[in-house]
Amino acid sequence: MSVLDEIIDGVRADLAERQARVSLDELKERVAKAPAAKDGVAALRGDGVKVICEVKRSSPSKGALAAIADPAALAADYEAGGASVISVLTEQRRFGGSLADLEAVRAKVDIPVLRKDFIVTSYQLWEARAYGADLALLIVAALEQPALESLIERAVSIGLTPIVEVHDEDEAERAVDAGAKVIGVNARNLKTLKVDRTTFERVAPEIPEGIVKIAESGVRGPHDLIAYANAGADAVLVGESLVTGRDPKAAVADLVAAGTHPALRHGRG
């Protein structure tokens, strides 16, 4: 069994427990009373390379990364540093996240918030909106094509911007065929958990113009952002290097400065 399969098995077990406690109708009622979702696509377009900053306590590849007692405070630092979107891990078993983290971050920041999890049912999309997410991650490798297409459609219908994650050219083709408007290319191999920063430059040419392209994994600092930008990235997603660093706000500001350097503006937007 692959790492992804193990994670999804755990996700389904935890999901069943939540569904037993909170009905879909309850989630829908909460969403109906919630403010409209922020425009995730608009947040990722425009001049320069946008920075998505992640609240991430642990990972399957590295184990514990940071305690993060106050995810809202960390998110506020990210926002103050110039982040365009905050990503919140809500998977508990491998990443140490929760829906409570998502809710706390949403209450603290004004920029769009992404629910990053292993979403396999529409119930999780309703959860995402109910707890304040504006965007939701959908992983091609975790979904059959009909499910991927259905979840993209459902996400959009309830106000979420789906970020469709791919790892290779075939998955990119599936994402495009499913109607993705935002595609994240993850440089981390799901089987080996190793990062290959050349993944983005291989896969990005398969993604048509007009679709927002996000480079995920492997961003250690401004030099990696610039490399991804030169390969066509509209945005980068950064987690580990921020939560393990001494000054997240300053680190984000450095990334944002690199992403808005005049030399990178030509041809972007």
Curated annotation (Swiss-Prot):
InterPro entries: Aldolase_TIM (IPR013785), Indole-3-glycerol_P_synth (IPR045186), Indole-3-glycerol_P_synth_dom (IPR013798), Indole-3-GlycerolPSynthase_CS (IPR001468), RibuloseP-bd_barrel (IPR011060). NCBIfam families: PRK00278.1-1, PRK00278.2-4. Signal peptide: none annotated. The gene is trpC. The lineage of its organism: Bacteria, Bacillati, Actinomycetota, Actinomycetes, Kitasatosporales. It comes from Streptomyces avermitilis (strain ATCC 31267 / DSM 46492 / JCM 5070 / NBRC 14893 / NCIMB 12804 / NRRL 8165 / MA-4680). It catalyses: 1-(2-carboxyphenylamino)-1-deoxy-D-ribulose 5-phosphate + H(+) = (1S,2R)-1-C-(indol-3-yl)glycerol 3-phosphate + CO2 + H2O. Keywords: Amino-acid biosynthesis, Aromatic amino acid biosynthesis, Decarboxylase, Lyase, Tryptophan biosynthesis. The keyword Endoplasmic reticulum does not apply. It comes from the Bacteria. This is Indole-3-glycerol phosphate synthase. Pathway: Amino-acid biosynthesis; L-tryptophan biosynthesis; L-tryptophan from chorismate: step 4/5. The keyword Amino-acid biosynthesis applies. One of its GO terms (biological process) is L-tryptophan biosynthetic process. Belongs to the TrpC family. HAMAP family: IGPS_A (MF_00134_A), IGPS_B (MF_00134_B). Its EC number is 4.1.1.48. GO terms for molecular function: indole-3-glycerol-phosphate synthase activity; phosphoribosylanthranilate isomerase activity.
